[in-house]
Amino acid sequence: MSGDEDARLPVAAAGDADPTLAEILRRYFDGEISAPVTLMQLLIEMEDADAVAGAVRAMVRDMERAAAGSVAHRRARELEQLMKANSAGCERIAMMLRADVDSAKPARSVEEGIAFCERLFDWSVQQSEEASVALYSLGSPELLQRATDEIVVQLRRWGLVTANTDLLDIGCGIGRLLVALAPRVRHATGIDVSAEMVKAAQRRCAGLDNVTVIKGDGYGLTGLADASFDAAIAVDSFPYLRQSGYALVERYVADAARVLRSRGELVILNYSYSEDADTEAKELRALAEQSGFDVVEVGGRPFRLWDGVVFRLRRR
């Protein structure tokens, strides 16, 4: 039996119960998403860590009977072992999902959207600092650090992290990237709308003389000086801006252009959580044109652990 045929076994079994679960598993066995992202997506769909663990165990048993020793069987076992190793974190994430504090519904106004983000992240960070900024971390500091390291490596490959770089992290969350980047840049500034996130970031960055963390008002980059940064990054923050209204996205991109120096880059990692890549690309190109950016990259997926999508804009 070929590897592709092996992988069809758990996908078909899941499809009998739920086509969405089948699609998640298909993407995993086809190598499109990592094991942590797969478990995150299963948790989002099922909102029950025990149910996810049971489904994964059943899948492994089926694979042992039909395709023991195959590549697909080993991949299934990897998923099972990851679930076991992070059972407490997965249960915490399932609890967070069941609490129904988050919502994918577009806000009725920018004001409502900003208030929603403040409430959501003030609450989330108190449940799990790691999961509050990356559900795919499964609440694990180690997994989150691996994902963070991947981002830092990519920023360095793009030439955006040097000893002379003044960097801005838009939606800095708990400050994980500020901590990782501080030894590699001249100065790093983080801004976030959530007071509780800012507290966590300030605590994690305590003792780092070249890091500043500030609470923003959510309406833009108010208070940051013109032409004061060489690079700005936004990791999983633009989806919430977009959910709050396109006008807010326009404001942030225009503000990024204002605070960046000439040839400085705005790196957006995930612009939205939509599956509509064409719409994302069209919007980003329009935003770039109206705010004085050139488009460097649209839609890249360079990460192994995380399924983040890259959008890079360079200030003219």
Task: Label each residue range with its predicted role.
Residues 2-148:
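N-terminal accessory regions of S-adenosyl-L-methionine
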